[in-house]
Amino acid sequence: MKNFASIKDEIQKIAESILKEYNLQIYEINNFFDFESDVLQILVEDITEPNKALDFDSIISSNEKLSDALENFPGLSEPYMLEVASAGIEKPIRSKDELVKAVNSYIHVELNQEKNTSSEIEGILLDFDVNKDTFRITYFLKGQKKKVDFKYEQVKFARYAVKF
């Protein structure tokens, strides 16, 4: 789509109103060329629990309803393929607000500096202390339970993780 940047906000408004009906929200909107056609990809997550497993029927129904709504959208005159999909179980946590929503979730976090001899930690994000502006994560290191406090500014990268 040559004009994707100019119509992305309008597509987002249309999609948001439809996705709310299915308790979904937009995680990311992408446009790329694949299989010899333009693809409009809308990655979604649950509104209340960002890392909750999504109902396949909700994704299909929202895709169909969104397809109908975009059919007469003037900015999409060229042929394209619509893909509404889950953002994924190990999706990146991109902001402080998203990290706050991840409290009580199992996450992977990479810090700018080592804490307890490690800069990469996988564990349960226990808490966000508003007064101290710090997060607390609990994890196991060599069989021992550890807790570490960190500020969002110390985070190099964070994502949801799967505990095995």
UniProtKB/Swiss-Prot annotation:
This is Ribosome maturation factor RimP. It is found in: Cytoplasm. The keyword Cytoplasm applies. Belongs to the RimP family. Its main location: cytoplasm. Signal peptide: none annotated. The keyword tRNA-binding does not apply. GO terms for cellular component: cytosol. Keywords: Cytoplasm, Ribosome biogenesis. One of its GO terms (biological process) is ribosomal small subunit assembly. InterPro entries: Ribosome_maturation_RimP, RimP_C, RimP_C_sf, RimP_N, RimP_N_sf.
